[in-house]
Each structure stands twice: as C-alpha cells, then as structure tokens.
Amino acid sequence: MQDIRSDWYIIGASAIIMSDIKIGKTSDIDILTTKEGADEWRIALQEYMELNLVTKEGDLFRSKFSRFKLPLIDIEVMGGLQVNKNGKWKDVLVSDFHQMPVGDTIVKIPTLNELERILRLFGRDKDLKRLALIAKQQQQYS
C-alpha cells in the first residue's frame, strides 16, 4: 500500500466496525479513492485482481471498480465513485475523517457522522439498517 499515492478511505461495513460499532462481520473491505488511485491499487494488487468482473447495482453506482481476492479478505476499490440520486450522478466524497494505524499503515476512515451521511446518500436497505444500528448503539452510550 506504500505505492498508493492518491488519497483513499476505508468506507462501508469495515469503517463502521473500525469505529467500534457492532454490526456483525463483513466479507470485504471497501476502499473509496480517485480514478487515479484505482489505477494505483490495480498495479499494487494486480496478482489478486478478479478478472471478468460483473458488478451489481450499476444503476445506482458507477466508478472505476476492482475487486481483489486476498487470502484473508476481499478488497473492493471504487475510484471516482458516484451514486445516482433522482436521475443525477453525485460524487461520493469524504470531507471529514480520522486516521488509524493498522499494522505498518495509517488508514483514513470517515468520522461516524460522515459515515452516516454516506449511508443516507446510498440509501439501500442494508445502509438504512446500518444507520439504525449506529443510532441504537450511540443511544446506549450517551
């Protein structure tokens, strides 16, 4: 990951789990980056890249997408991610984040408020369920 120069963020379930919210397990790590960053990930993890990839939810999301099948967990990289809201494509950007050490790497994770904003933007059933879990756990600790 040292070869990746573009900004990148862990989003989705992994970021929620890393924010100490108990939502269960996840089967992959979602990475949000730029289109250039997506190319850097493809070079860095080329031996693990899934070929002939078919994506789901193409009517909701578009990006420079790659999936990498690593021994312990899959990594999905979305470069220049956009979400379709009311027929218009909106860029998915992270504006507020914190950094966390993971092994020898420092990773960027959106703040919990930012994760909630992104989940609302995505608006799928699983996103709304995660929002409810976050709200429930925040109430327990406040």
Protein language model features and the residues they cover:
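Compositionally biased terminal segments of proteins
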Residues: 1-142
